[in-house]
Amino acid sequence: MQVYLVGGAVRDYLLGHPYQEKDYVVVGATPEHMLAQGFQPVGKDFPVFLHPETKEEYALARTERKSGQGYHGFQFFTDTTVSLEDDLIRRDLTINAIAMDQDGKIYDPYGGQNDLENKILRHVSEAFAEDPLRVLRVARFAARYFPYGFQIAPETLQLMQTMADSGELDALTPERVWKETSRALMENHADIYFQTLRNCGALKHLFPEIDALFGVPQRPEYHPEVDCGIHTLMSLQQACKSNYSLDVRFAVLVHDLGKALTPAEELPRHIMHEERGIKPVTQLCERLRVPTQTKQLALSVCKEHLKCHQIMSLKPGTLWRLLQRLDVLRRPERVEAFVQACECDAKGRLGLEDRPYPQAQYMREAMQIVRSIKVQDLPENIKGAEIGEMLIQYRIEALAEFKNQHQSLSHS
């Protein structure tokens, strides 16, 4: 039996890109051979085994044949006669169809090294079209390797367009779409993922709420980039640049969905777009089964981001109620995530990317002020329901004093 390192580890090794996961393919072995050597079986659909010591995955070389729609619509065949070339041809991109043996020798039957050198993402064979998830994977690779200058081969982009138009993407489960998208959102250039999906026509099928933003105008005095879709991707760039969490990145992505629902006669103004956005954000989250915590922040940012931009002019009571809705006393980290998302929105505008956003520091200081006021600060004779009422009163008074101090400093 022969063992080869395959896939992403070889690709990233040749690129000089860091990698962690290692996947191996085993040629000329049977499940019985693997079990006899102490490997643990883990594959449900096809024979995959864990190494007894390293726990790394070893899969028997296999071929596959399309038998139905979607990601799981395949029949697999594994046998000692299946060659390395047979196994590699079923992979998505040439740069992922390179293998390395235990002596470090490279096997590259489909030109992956040449495409690595020329910075091209190219499909291995027409079998690429049999798995709709590959459209999302290529978009994610386009985002990951954007800093290296990689481009999608024209024939691959055309095939992705054909797949998007065919309706095959409808067979993808919400879990698979979210898993691939959440991974893409954590890339340093996540905006390229969504731009690629738009370029191949997949965005309107998978994320119609986001696709609808493109071509919708905004007031140029506030948004020099004008287009709502471009603003969304520029805001996402800011979140990636700051290395913010998945929750923040997703909230930034969907914060302006309501602008796609602005009546035509009101354009380019978007009055009440925050309220209009609640329904499409909720629909998108429920359709993709987005985790609850991620959904909650997205809805908060959608509903409240204008209040953050206007925070220094808010009345103390209004600011307290905003902080309360963000669960400031129990979850200060959520307030921080909210501030981060709002700052990305403010900086996701053409020519304003480096403009200061003092609202962020104001919000953080306000959060610390209300959190610093405890029951122990109240008069001893306060009892029962009065405790909660007086705590609120103290916090609002403290916010009023903070606002006055801030205004005095800004006018001095």
Swiss-Prot record:
UniProt-listed GO biological process terms: RNA repair; tRNA 3'-terminal CCA addition
Positions that bind CTP: G8, R11, R91, R137, R140
Reactions this protein catalyses: a tRNA precursor + 2 CTP + ATP = a tRNA with a 3' CCA end + 3 diphosphate; a tRNA with a 3' CCA end + 2 CTP + ATP = a tRNA with a 3' CCACCA end + 3 diphosphate
Entry note about domains: Comprises two domains: an N-terminal domain containing the nucleotidyltransferase activity and a C-terminal HD domain associated with both phosphodiesterase and phosphatase activities.
Chain sites annotated for binding ATP: G8, R11, R91, R137, R140
Pfam families: HD, PolyA_pol, PolyA_pol_RNAbd
Cofactor: Mg(2+); Ni(2+)
Record key words, sorted: ATP-binding, Hydrolase, Magnesium, Metal-binding, Multifunctional enzyme, Nickel, Nucleotide-binding, Nucleotidyltransferase, RNA repair, RNA-binding, Transferase, tRNA processing
NCBIfam families xref list: PRK10885.1
UniProt-recorded Gene Ontology molecular function terms: ATP binding; CCA tRNA nucleotidyltransferase activity; cyclic-nucleotide phosphodiesterase activity; magnesium ion binding; phosphatase activity; tRNA binding
Domain of life from the UniProt record: Bacteria
Something else known: A single active site specifically recognizes both ATP and CTP and is responsible for their addition.
HD domain residues: 228-329
Residues engaged in binding Mg(2+): E21, D23
Name under which the protein is recorded: Multifunctional CCA protein
Function noted in UniProt: Catalyzes the addition and repair of the essential 3'-terminal CCA sequence in tRNAs without using a nucleic acid template. Adds these three nucleotides in the order of C, C, and A to the tRNA nucleotide-73, using CTP and ATP as substrates and producing inorganic pyrophosphate. tRNA 3'-terminal CCA addition is required both for tRNA processing and repair. Also involved in tRNA surveillance by mediating tandem CCA addition to generate a CCACCA at the 3' terminus of unstable tRNAs. While stable tRNAs receive only 3'-terminal CCA, unstable tRNAs are marked with CCACCA and rapidly degraded.
Record has Hydrolase as a keyword: yes
Lineage: Bacteria, Pseudomonadati, Pseudomonadota, Gammaproteobacteria, Moraxellales
Subunit field text: Monomer. Can also form homodimers and oligomers.
EC number(s) on file: 2.7.7.72, 3.1.3.-, 3.1.4.-
Protein's UniProt keywords contain Ribosomal protein: no
Family: Belongs to the tRNA nucleotidyltransferase/poly(A) polymerase family. Bacterial CCA-adding enzyme type 1 subfamily.
Comment on bound cofactor: Magnesium is required for nucleotidyltransferase activity.
Gene from which this protein is expressed: cca
